[in-house]
């Protein structure tokens, strides 16, 4: 629960930076030119993109099962491949690049243990995909509503220690 609250808080904070992707940004005396570098803007954009990944993954599964042509199994496997790609790439790199300064048996034993851990992480990622997508949608929608409509409670921040204490009560 602490992780989820922290993630929600961070996504809200990232989306409050949305105006900083434009050429004019809020200033103390009204709009002023944005002085952020292109790299800084790219980092903001990348955080926004990353906050929508679980939503996009879940939508891909749902649309593949309901609207896309062909067998739903094909779309499911494609979606699973996309979710598993980081783990698969890491495993393949570990298999083809063994260290030269260590013996292979302990190394590949560790790779095997990492494979089991990665499979467990992948399973949990899939089990919690809908929940994590909901957390992201809620955080994004709440922020956009507050920024565009109510203009209230934009700085609804809690420190990690406050979140942790609230959970343990």
Give the ranges of each region predicted by the language model.
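Alpha-helical transmembrane segments and their membrane-interface junctions
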Residues: 130-140
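Juxtamembrane membrane-water interface segments that cap and precede transmembrane helices
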Residues: 163-166
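Non-transmembrane catalytic domains and loops of membrane-associated enzymes and transporters
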Residues: 1-122, 126-132, 146-161
């Amino acid at each position: 629960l602490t992780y989820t609250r922290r993630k929600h808080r961070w996504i809200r904070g990232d989306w409050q930076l949305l105006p900083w992707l434009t050429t004019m940004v809020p200033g103390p005396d009204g709009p002023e030119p944005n002085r952020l570098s292109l790299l800084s803007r790219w980092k903001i954009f990348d955080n926004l993109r990353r906050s929508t990944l679980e939503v996009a993954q879940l939508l891909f599964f749902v649309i593949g099962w309901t609207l896309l042509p062909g067998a739903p199994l094909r779309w499911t496997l494609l979606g699973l491949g996309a979710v598993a790609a980081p783990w698969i790439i890491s495993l393949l790199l570990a298999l083809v690049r063994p260290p030269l300064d260590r013996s292979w048996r302990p190394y590949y034993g560790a790779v095997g243990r990492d494979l089991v851990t990665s499979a467990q992480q992948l399973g949990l990622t899939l089990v919690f995909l809908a929940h994590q997508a909901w957390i992201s949608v809620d955080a994004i929608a709440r922020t956009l509503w507050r920024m565009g409509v109510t203009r209230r409670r934009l700085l609804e921040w809690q420190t990690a220690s406050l979140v942790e204490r609230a959970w343990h009560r």
